[in-house]
Amino acid sequence: YDPGNSAVAKSNARVIEAHLRHTPPVDLLVTSETNGDEFAKLLGLHHHSFDPDRTQVPVSSTQIREDLISNWHLLGPGSRELLAIRAVFIGAESTGTTTTTLAVQSELMKRQGNFATTNWIREYGRDLTMRKKEQAEAMGLSEYAVPWTTNDFVEIAIVQQQLEDVAARTGGPVVCCDTDVFATIIWERRYLGEKAALPMPGDSQNRIYFVTQPDGVPFVQDKIRDSEELRISMTREFEDD
C-alpha cells in the first residue's frame, strides 16, 4: 500500500478484494500502520490499530521482506512452510545422500541465528523397506516375497511430504531433505515399471536438487540395498528427470 499514490493504493485494494472473494467473509482489517484507516476504507472494512509503536512485534512486513533470514523467527508456521528453501539430496543407493544431507544440516546450524533450527528430513521409504523386510522374515519368507505395490509408494509420497512440511513450519530458512516426492516417483518406476502411477510434481521455485554421484564412493550393502551395478543407471535416471 502506497499512501502517496492513490492509483497504486486502489490497485492493491482490488487485488486484495479478489483474494477475499475466495475466503470466508471478512469485515475487519488489523494493522500497525498509520495509514490503516485509509486503506481499510478502500476495502470497505473496519480498522483496528494494533501495536502501532511496535513494542510487541518489533518489525514490519517491509523489514521482513528486506531481510527474510534475520527475521525468520518472527514468521508464522504457514509463512515458513511456503518460503523455506528445500535443499533436496537425491541419488542412487550408497552414494552418500544421507551423509551429505546431514553434513549440510550441520554446517548450516553452525551459522547460529535462525539457521540453528535447521531441520533434516529422513527417508521414510527406508522405514517402510525395513518394515516389509521384517514382515517377510516373520512369515519365514525371502524379503523379495513381499512385493512393492502402488499403495506403498503412495504412502511414501504422502508421508515424505508431510514430514517435509512439518520441518518447514518448525525450522529455519532451509530444510535439508534426504529425498522427496520426486525421488519417490523415480524409485516407483524402478520397482513397478509400467504400473507406476504417481504423477510428477509441479515445478517449485524454492526447491534445489543435488544429485549425489557413485564415483569414488564405496558400495556398502546394508541388507536392503540393490546391487552396486544398479547405481550407474539409477544415477542417470535422476539426472535425466
Each language-model region and where it sits:
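A glycine- and Lys/Arg-enriched "phosphate-lid" helix/loop adjacent to the NTP-binding pocket
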Residues: 64, 192-241
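Short loop/turn segments at strand-loop or loop-helix junctions that form parts
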Residues: 1, 123-125, 178-181, 211-216
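Glycine-rich phosphate-binding P-loop
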Residues: 87-106
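Nucleotidyltransferase catalytic core that binds NTPs
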Residues: 1-86
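Surface-exposed cleft-lining segments at the edges of enzyme active sites
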Residues: 87-91, 134-152, 182-187, 221-226
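Glycine-rich phosphate-binding loop used to anchor ATP phosphates in small-molecule kinases
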Residues: 152-204, 213, 220
